[in-house]
Each structure stands twice: as C-alpha cells, then as structure tokens.
UniProtKB/Swiss-Prot annotation:
InterPro entries: Med7/Med21-like, Mediator_Med21. GO terms for cellular component: mediator complex. Residues 53-130 form a coiled coil. The keyword Nuclease does not apply. Pfam families: Med21. The lineage of its organism: Eukaryota, Fungi, Dikarya, Ascomycota, Saccharomycotina. This is Mediator of RNA polymerase II transcription subunit 21. SUPFAM superfamilies: Mediator hinge subcomplex-like. PANTHER family: MEDIATOR OF RNA POLYMERASE II TRANSCRIPTION SUBUNIT 21 (PTHR13381:SF0), RNA POLYMERASE II HOLOENZYME COMPONENT SRB7 (PTHR13381). Component of the Mediator complex.
Length: 143
C-alpha cells in the first residue's frame, strides 16, 4: 500500500488524464454549431460527429468520472495529517510515536537475544548428542 501523498499524486495524474480525455473527446466528436445567428453552420466531411444523444450520454459519463475522482482526491486530502490539527498536536503525536518506536525496538532486541540464546542451546545440544553417538559407536567397536 502506498502512502497518502503518493495516492494523492496518482489521483491527480489520473484526473489530468481524464480532463485531457474529455477535452479530446469533445474536440473530436462535437457537432458544428454557429457561435451566433449571423454565422453559417460549418461542416467538415471528414469529421466524425456523434449523434447528440450519444454525445450527451458520453459527456455525462466523463463528467461523472471527473466528479468521482474529485471526491476521491478530497477524501485523500482530508485524511492527510495536519488537516484541522495544530502544530503542537502534531509534535505531541510525533513524540508519542517515537516513544512507541523505541519501546518496540527494545522488544525486538530482547527477542533477538532470546532467539540467539535458544539457537546456541540447540547447537550445544546437537553437538553433545552427536558427540554422544560418536562415542557410543567407538565403544561398540572396541567391545
């Protein structure tokens, strides 16, 4: 899982792609409308003009996607630390987390020491067992 700032950057990149895609769609598929009543309606025989209903449906879908992405971005921004939190509260939280980290690091070191002691005990027992087997084989040959 990525951190919130990375998620926010990814969402902003995706939103920019959605904007570009929407503008490109409108540019490539719009109908030719005069800007005022005195202008003639222009046409381009090579243009791919989508039916108005389909065009409107696709525009609605594109805008819905952009709105959803905007909401996702807003939720990420709201979840960032520091929003509605004073600097003093943030420092207190950092101090608390540092103390927690130190405690957990000590627990980790203790666990590593216990593991090392157990490994040494197993090694010693294995060595003693191997020596015992070797000695019993030697005694059996002598008899």
């Amino acid at each position: 899982m990525t951190d919130r700032l990375t998620q926010l950057q990814i969402c902003l990149d995706q939103m920019m792609e959605q904007f570009c895609g929407a503008v490109n769609y409108v540019d490539k598929n719009h109908g030719f409308e005069p800007s005022n009543d005195s202008e003639e309606q222009m046409s381009d025989p090579q243009a791919h003009i989508v039916e108005e209903k389909e065009f409107e449906k696709n525009i609605d879908e594109l805008t819905t996607d952009i709105i959803l992405k905007t909401r996702q971005i807003m939720a990420l921004i709201d979840s960032l630390p520091g929003v509605d939190v004073s600097a003093q509260e943030q420092l207190h939280r950092i101090d608390s987390l540092q103390k927690q980290l130190i405690k957990m690091e000590k627990e980790k070191i203790d666990a590593i020491k216990r593991k090392d002691a157990l490994q040494e005990k197993v090694r010693t027992l294995t060595q003693d067992f191997t020596i015992g087997i070797n000695e019993s084989k030697t005694e059996a040959r002598l008899v």
